[in-house]
Amino acid sequence: MAAEPVIVEAVRTPIGKRGGALANLHPAYLLGETYRELLGRTGIHADCVEQIVGGTVTHAGEQSMNPARNAWLTVGLPYETAATTVDCQCGSSQQASHMVANMVAAGVIDVGISCGVEAMSRVPLGSGSKHGPGKPWPDEWNVDLPNQFEAAERIARKRGLTRENVDSLGLISQERAAVAWAEERFKRETYAVQVPTTEEEQAAGQGMWRLVDHDEGLRDTTMEGLARLKPVMPTAIHTAGNSSQISDGACAIMWASKRMARALKLKPRARIVAQALVGSDPHFHLDGPIDATRAVLGKAGMSLRDIDLVEINEAFASVVLSWAQVFDQDLEKVNVNGGAIALGHPVGATGARLITTALHELERRDKEFALITMCAGGALATGTIIQRL
């Protein structure tokens, strides 16, 4: 039986930097506490949640063996709730959100959670793979799938982007994120995570635990400071100042049928207008958000003029600038509170984080439509248009 899936709540952790405040937390605990926060905000019993679909990129070590399920059990939630963890690379939790919404729409479940977690400090990207993803290629394969850095450089060359262009976006991201935190724009979408203190902090009388309530990746920088950063390769333009960060974090979104939301006295806050998972040219695979944007706009019968806010993941500055150049867009409504360059990119959690941020900002601005898109490893890209209700 068909039903209309709606978002009733969405919350994320602050994003921790590499080796930062969240680095001592097991990913199961990080996501598990996010589940508990989500349930606490809705006020419903955990028994109401029928299925969970989570996203993680590096399925190894502490993130192996279905972390979405492990996290649920780790914090003592009912074992009857089923969970699946998917791998769609950086698009994992965005695609997980599509999957949960689709299960609700199909009448398979009435209440579900989509989520994502990545503890990159503890489980480095690519862990468990000796040669890298899918390598060595069989001789008969003709695959030109560059690493992420080279992919970013390729689209920069294709679009004629300069070092100044990408540094400028890096600065904009930092400045917007700083303003967003100063104005408490992220306060509703985040919760304070309890973390163990260091020996030095305990010696200073801080106790055994402290609360982390802000994203850690923000930096006070300038164009001059960014220009001094060296790229990995002499001829390249991407540096640590105009690329996403290695991060730790989790995010969770609760979905329900409109009928069940009413029965549980939960406010429907948004719905999906259109969704897409697309394959893109492996040679230029970080241009995938361009293909995903065309796909969701086409499915929705909309144009970018109809979109109030855009969240496009800042994996590298060239991803956003290439997208903007192709669609002839300025950045006025793109990543209005900064992006992954400033906030961080806990890869498996970022898709859900982008949806969460877009929803809260639509509500804050009293706007209606947001487009969320991101590139993903393996020459994939995800796209979602949500409508605030």
Segments predicted by a language model, with ranges:
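Active-site pocket-lining segment
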Residues: E153, E189-Y191, V273-A342
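Active-site-proximal alpha-helical scaffold in enzymes
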Residues: V86-V117, A156-F186, A252-R259, P346-K367, ...
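Glycine-rich loop/linker segments at domain edges
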Residues: K17, A101-R159, R219-T221, T235
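Short, well-ordered amphipathic alpha-helical segments that serve as non-catalytic structural scaffolds
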Residues: P27-G43, P67-A71, A96, Q148-I155, ...
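N-terminal extracellular/periplasmic Venus flytrap/periplasmic-binding protein-like
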Residues: R12-T13, N24, G32-E33, R41, ...
